Amino acid sequence: FHPDFSGRENIYFNASIFGLTRKEIDERLNKIIEFSELEGYIDNPVRTYSSGMYMRLAFSVAINVDADILLIDEILSVGDQHFQEKCYKKIEDLKAQGKTIVIVTHGMDTVNRFCTRAVWLHQGKIKMDGDAESVTKVYLEETA
């Protein structure tokens, strides 16, 4: 996001980077804002947003651009419990639609809840690659 742009301007800016036309963004704008729950702040510069607000807006844009692959990098670690659960439900919906979701996390519960495959990286190298349950089990044993 551009820190001096408002949340609304950043929606247009970022959605256009993902290839959406102005008309497509116009059609999705209210849905994006509503999901983010930032209605009262959407016209403020994002530099005034907390990390949780920033994450809400980023996630809301990402899930509304119809990408085939969604990359979630520790993004849900800053949101409140209500919004996290809302995001988790959306992730489950996207997974059910056959979307590919790549989650970067240190949360093994998150890995086991959403992933069929897990890759454990250690010092920039793949330490283990396999089904989520097996990888998280070994990870927890070795890092305890």
Positions of predicted regions on the chain:
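Conserved ABC ATPase "signature" C-loop
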Residues: 123-124, 139
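Conserved ABC ATPase signature
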Residues: 45-52
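Helical segment within the ABC ATPase nucleotide-binding domain
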Residues: 84-97
